[in-house]
Swiss-Prot record:
Main location: cytoplasm
Binding site for pyruvate: 49, 208
Function: Catalyzes the condensation of (S)-aspartate-beta-semialdehyde [(S)-ASA] and pyruvate to 4-hydroxy-tetrahydrodipicolinate (HTPA).
Biological source species: Chlorobium phaeobacteroides (strain DSM 266 / SMG 266 / 2430)
Active site: 137, 166
Record-level GO cellular component terms: cytosol
Gene Ontology biological process: diaminopimelate biosynthetic process; lysine biosynthetic process via diaminopimelate
Site keyed Part of a proton relay during catalysis: positions: 48, 111
Name of the featured protein: 4-hydroxy-tetrahydrodipicolinate synthase
A Pfam match: DHDPS
EC nos: 4.3.3.7
Length: 296
C-alpha cells in the first residue's frame, strides 16, 4: 500500500511585508490560521511565491520558525530552501530543518544550467544533509533547464527522503512518465493550478498552488473531487475559477495574488524590488474578477 507523505492541496504561501519592507509577522500568523481553518494540507513558506530570492538566510529561518510555531502540528510545513549553489542549498536545507520545517522544497539549480548528473549530485548532497522529506522542484520556465524524468526517478529510488516532485514543466509526457515509473511512496505534485483537473485525473497526488492563497478550501475541494473521480464537480469548479488561475499570472507571480490578498484584507500590498505593484489596468481587471467570484 502507498504511504505517500506529500499529497493534497498545498499553498505556495506569500510573504507579507510592511511598508518599510520588513516582514509583517502578524499578517504571516494570520495567513497560517487562515489555511488551518480552510483545511489546507501543506503550507509552503519561502518559495517563489514567497519572494524567496529577496529574503536573507536569517529572514528565511525566521519565517519558517514563525510558520512552524503557528502551525503547531495542525498543518504540515514544507519550507522552501533552495538555490543554485549546492553548498548554500545544503545550508538553507539544514536551517529549514532546524527552524521546524516538516519537509523541504528545493528548486532545481537555475542560471548555471547543470547537466543531469549535476542536478543529481546537487540533490544528493541535500538529501544526505537532512533527515526530513525533500520535494524536488522542477520549473524550467524559471530555471532555464529541465530536470528530466529519468533524473527525478533516479533520485527517488536512491534516496528515501526524496519524497516528491513539484512538477511545473507543463510537459505532459514527462508527467506521465513520472506517474507510471515512480517508486511506490514517491509523490508527484503539479505546480500549475490550470492543470489540477487533468493532472489529478492522470493519477497525480495533489497541487502546490498559488490560487490556494485566495481560495484554499476551493482548491482542496477541486483536488479531492478530481482524485475521487467526481468529474462533474471538478469540471464545474475548474470552469468557475479558471480565469482566476490564469489572472494570477497576468504579471509576475506573486504580484497579482498579493494584490488580491490586500483586497481581501489579509495583507498590505507591499513587494520587494525588483517586483513592483500591478499596473492600474491589470488591477481593475483582477478586482473585477474577484468581485465576480464573491471574494471581495
Amino acid at each position: 500500500m502507498s504511504t505517500r507523505y506529500i499529497a493534497g492541496s498545498a499553498v505556495a504561501l506569500v510573504t507579507p511585508f510592511r511598508k518599510n519592507n520588513t516582514i509583517d509577522t502578524d499578517a504571516l500568523k494570520k495567513l497560517v490560521q487562515f489555511h488551518i481553518e480552510a483545511g489546507t494540507d501543506i503550507i509552503i513558506p519561502c518559495g517563489t511565491t514567497g519572494e524567496s530570492p529577496t529574503l536573507t538566510s536569517d529572514e528565511q529561518f525566521r519565517i519558517i520558525r514563525i510558520v512552524s510555531e503557528e502551525a503547531d502540528g495542525k498543518i504540515m510545513v514544507a519550507a522552501g530552501a533552495g538555490t543554485n549553489a549546492t553548498a548554500h542549498a545544503v545550508e538553507l536545507a539544514k536551517n529549514a530543518e532546524k527552524a521546524g520545517a516538516s519537509a523541504i522544497l528545493s528548486v532545481a539549480p537555475y542560471y548555471n544550467k547543470p547537466s543531469q548528473e549535476g542536478f543529481y549530485q546537487h540533490f544528493r548532497h541535500i538529501a544526505e544533509a537532512v533527515s526530513v522529506p525533500i520535494i524536488v522542484y522542477n520549473v524550467p520556465g524559471r530555471t532555464g533547464s529541465n530536470l528530466s524524468a529519468s533524473t527525478i526517478l533516479r533520485l527517488a529510488r536512491d534516496f528515501a527522503n526524496i519524497a516528491a516532485v513539484k512538477e511545473a514543466s507543463d510537459n505532459m509526457n514527462q508527467i506521465m512518465e513520472l506517474l507510471e515509473e515512480r517508486p511506490e511512496n514517491f509523490s508527484v505534485m503539479t505546480g500549475e493550478d490550470m492543470l489540477i483537473l487533468p493532472f489529478m485525473a492522470m493519477g497525480g497526488d495533489g497541487v502546490i498552488s498559488v490560487a490556494a492563497n485566495q481560495i484554499p478550501s476551493t482548491v482542496k475541494q477541486l483536488v479531492i473531487a478530481a482524485k475521487q473521480g467526481n468529474l462533474d464537480e471538478a469540471r464545474a469548479l475548474n470552469r468557475k475559477y479558471r480565469r482566476l488561475f490564469k489572472m494570477n499570472f497576468i504579471e509576475s507571480n506573486p504580484v497579482p495574488v498579493k494584490y488580491c490578498l490586500s483586497l481581501m484584507g489579509m495583507i498590505e500590498e507591499n513587494y520587494r524590488l525588483p517586483l513592483v505593484p500591478l499596473s492600474d489596468e491589470n488591477k481593475a481587471v483582477l478586482k473585477k474578477e474577484m468581485e465576480f467570484l464573491g471574494l471581495i
